[in-house]
């Protein structure tokens, strides 16, 4: 039995998230169906992050165990011939059986893209939130967001329906920058709560539009005022960029290799 890791890219617009569920098309379901065609038996997959419906991934990490003579590096080409064009395997490698796509990850990186331009742009419409009513003050947004760095209880930024035991997580870094009309919100954390990034972005946009102050933003999450956190950014602007491990298992470790070219600027 060997363990194979996949570097996966998908357009979340077409799927009801990563995780398999009844009466919905998900990325995990499609991927496991393709693996079944190869092996003729059920293969369970595990992902670094469980993206929600409509959320994209430029560098999702997945692993599965399989008893096969097919070398690990061959699965990328084999799977790409079976998968729809909205799911691509960028790389496949054999890894140690002790390595786990989820539990071995040191942190995950999500990026949210806001199109703050006056006019819509069809070429990025499905990968960004067109919030154009007011010019956003990204400096105010960054100042407010920096208070969340470190280990905190983010109960206010967790949608109902989560099965997590607690709402404490460690945010390693938050960066917000403007690249012309685009505002890029990058969050790196050891783990993310259900709907966390979209709720954070929804509140930060209110700060950027000066509808609420930084103090109000901070008060809402520090004092767990979940009922005051009502605005959630649309799913289409969110992308799971990658998961980082103590040892790189893929050759494609440069984000620029697989993140949409028009959204690369400002990557760190």
UniProtKB/Swiss-Prot annotation:
It is an enzyme of class 5 (isomerase). Substrate binds at residue 110. GO terms for biological process: tRNA pseudouridine synthesis. It holds the Pfam family PseudoU_synth_1. The keyword Ribosomal protein does not apply. It comes from the Bacteria. GO terms for molecular function: RNA binding; tRNA pseudouridine(38-40) synthase activity. Its EC number is 5.4.99.12. The active site is at 52 (nucleophile). Keywords: Isomerase, tRNA processing. It catalyses: uridine(38/39/40) in tRNA = pseudouridine(38/39/40) in tRNA. Formation of pseudouridine at positions 38, 39 and 40 in the anticodon stem and loop of transfer RNAs. HAMAP family: TruA (MF_00171). NCBIfam families: hisT_truA (TIGR00071). Belongs to the tRNA pseudouridine synthase TruA family. Homodimer. This is tRNA pseudouridine synthase A. It comes from Prochlorococcus marinus (strain MIT 9215).
């Amino acid at each position: 039995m060997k363990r194979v890791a996949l570097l996966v890219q998908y357009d979340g617009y077409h799927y009801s998230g990563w995780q398999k569920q009844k009466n919905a098309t998900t990325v995990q379901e499609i991927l496991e169906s393709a693996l079944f065609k190869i092996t003729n038996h059920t293969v369970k997959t595990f992902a670094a992050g469980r993206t929600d419906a409509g959320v994209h991934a430029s560098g999702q990490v997945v692993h599965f165990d399989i008893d096969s003579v097919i070398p690990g590096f061959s699965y990328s080409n084999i799977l790409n011939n079976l998968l729809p064009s909205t799911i691509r395997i960028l790389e496949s490698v054999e890894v140690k059986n002790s390595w786990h796509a989820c539990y071995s990850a040191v942190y995950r990186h999500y990026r949210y893209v806001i199109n703050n331009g006056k006019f819509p742009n069809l070429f990025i419409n499905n990968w960004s939130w067109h919030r154009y009513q007011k010019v956003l003050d990204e400096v105010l947004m960054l100042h407010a967001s920096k208070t969340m760095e470190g280990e905190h209880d983010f109960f206010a930024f967790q949608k109902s329906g989560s099965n997590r035991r607690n709402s404490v997580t460690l945010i390693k870094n938050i960066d917000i920058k403007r690249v012309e009309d685009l505002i890029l919100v990058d969050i790196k954390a050891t783990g993310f709560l259900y709907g966390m990034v979209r709720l954070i972005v929804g509140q930060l946009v209110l700060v950027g539009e000066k509808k609420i102050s930084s103090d109000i933003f901070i008060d809402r999450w520090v004092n767990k005022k979940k009922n005051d956190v009502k605005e959630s950014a649309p799913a289409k602007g969110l992308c799971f960029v990658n998961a980082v491990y103590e040892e790189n298992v893929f050759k494609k470790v440069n984000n620029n290799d697989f993140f949409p070219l028009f959204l690369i600027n400002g990557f760190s």
